[in-house]
Amino acid sequence: MPVKLIMTWDIAPDHEQDYFEFVVSEFIPGIQRLGLEPAEAWATIYGDYPQIQVGMLAADTSSAKRIMASQDWSQLQEKLFTFVANFGYKVVPARGGFQF
């Protein structure tokens, strides 16, 4: 059963440009190489919620866990952490529509 890796974070102040360059040039291509399919990206405009939410699809829970245990995932995540704060994630059964 397909699952969705839902990640949330806030962009670190004064790192917006570097963050966007990293996401477009390294993070998205990197997660695609690992086997995750970008499904959605949301930005919070109002309220006390994470600034960014991203959804990635994996074939199943074991695939998601294998990807997240890989060295390549760790490297992408560590680089992401230089640009963001308050990172969180969860793996849930994928369904249509917005999931939080």
Where are the language model's segments positioned?
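Short, surface-exposed ligand-recognition loops at beta-strand->loop->(often short) alpha-helix junctions
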Residues: D10-F22
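Charged, often glycine-rich, active-site loop that binds/positions anionic groups
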Residues: Q53-G55
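Short, low-order "capping/linker" segments at domain edges
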Residues: V92-F100
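Active-site-flanking beta-strand signature of metal-NTP-handling nucleotidyl enzymes
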Residues: V3-D10
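A short beta-turn/loop motif at secondary-structure boundaries
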Residues: A43-D48, T82-F83
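An amphipathic, aromatic/His-enriched active-site/gating alpha helix that lines ligand/cofactor pockets
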Residues: V24-A39, L57-V92
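Residue-level signal for secondary-structure boundary sites
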Residues: H15, S62-A64, G97
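Residue-level preference for beta-strand/loop junctions
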Residues: M1-V3, D48-P50
